[in-house]
Amino acid sequence: MDLIDDFFRHAVKLAAPEKPSDTEQIDFRRAVSAAYYAVFHLLTMTAAESWAVGWERHRFARLFEHSRLKTASQALPGKLKERLGDNASPADQETADTLGAIARDFVALQQDRHSADYDNSRAWSYTEVENVILRAHHLYVGWNTVSKTPLAESYLLDMLGGK
């Protein structure tokens, strides 16, 4: 997924240019936004990979809306309890824990992106931006360990907003 890697590289480049004194707030803001978009596209492109018509996958990925991903992420803990019941296997519980962390990180990243894009009163520090990028990378790594599981695929379906 070259696009996701490009977003991560762009975020890092914006946050830490060759000359740190050249870093401006706009660079920090765009770095936060790029980190968020890396994970947004990671999730939507993963869902689109399952679409049978290969040449239409880009259109399928565009069906996802930011607000629906946030809603699905906020609702995920309850959905996981419902789907797993009381007798979850250790492997399913580990997957659920990873997905729970992914959902929390996604919501936090979306809030950070909104702040970076719309809250002009906030000044970002390098450390804050670095933490956003690290959170996005942590989500990326976690997602790659669980993305092919039934629980993850259900989460992706929830992101479309259907019942």
Q: Can you say where each PLM-predicted feature lies in the sequence?
A:
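Terminal alpha-helical segments
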Residues: 1-163
